[in-house]
Amino acid sequence: MKYIRKIPATDKEVSTKLVADGWIKLKEPSNLGVSILISVPFMIINGIIFAIIAYYLYPPLKELFNINNDLSITFTVNLVTFLYVIMFFIFMTIHEFLHASFIPKAFSSDKVYWGINGFVGFVYTTEKIKKGRYLIISVMPFILLSMILPFILSILGWLNWFTLFLCLMNAMGSSVDFLNMCLIAVQVPRGSEIINNGFETYFR
């Protein structure tokens, strides 16, 4: 697995060869910006799912819904704030490595890449992946970091506003993953293989 700064551009020659070999292009957004915009409904749904989990795990959260209490938010920038920012990027990196860990032989493959472009992390591969495996790769960071991790943190006594925030950002940030899952689930027949070429996805 290698580090890259951004997802490679689509190679038109590779696209032509894939089509000639019987691969079918997936109908999908043309770039990440459009994908994020279209995935907003998933962002909201994922956020609600996590909020329900957090509501029952973290009692102080219930106070936000108590109309008899005044809500006061104070934000202070100091050294701890910068540590929080660093932890946020570490958490985002963990999200991407969880994607990668479910790609067969990802850490020894020269066809698997990861990176962070601005505030958006990504894992990219040109390996052929079965549909079922692709869906697992896509959903696992959400399940592990936004559904299972809060329970573990609660048991350990480490569940607080900041760890809740990290889990929430992971849940909402998984929206593009869920969009891709829906596109794959609807368009790709069972048992098919999937391959990426830049921002284009093909199946056969």
What are these language model-derived features?
Residues 63-66, 87, 96, 100, ...:
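Short acidic/polar alpha-helix capping motifs at helix-coil junctions
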Residues 91-104, 141:
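Active-site recognition of the HExxH zinc-binding catalytic motif
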Residues 60-77:
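Perimembrane loop-to-helix junctions flanking transmembrane segments
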Residues 1-59, 118-204:
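Metalloprotease/metallohydrolase-associated module, dominated by Zn2+-dependent proteases
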Residues 75-91:
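Short pre-active-site segment immediately N-terminal to the catalytic Zn-binding motif
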Residues 89-94, 115-123:
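Hydrophobic, membrane-facing alpha-helical anchors
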Residues 99-112, 187:
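Catalytic Zn2+-binding segment of zinc metalloproteases
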Residues 72-77, 95-97, 124-126, 156-159:
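Short amphipathic alpha-helical segments, especially helix-boundary/capping motifs
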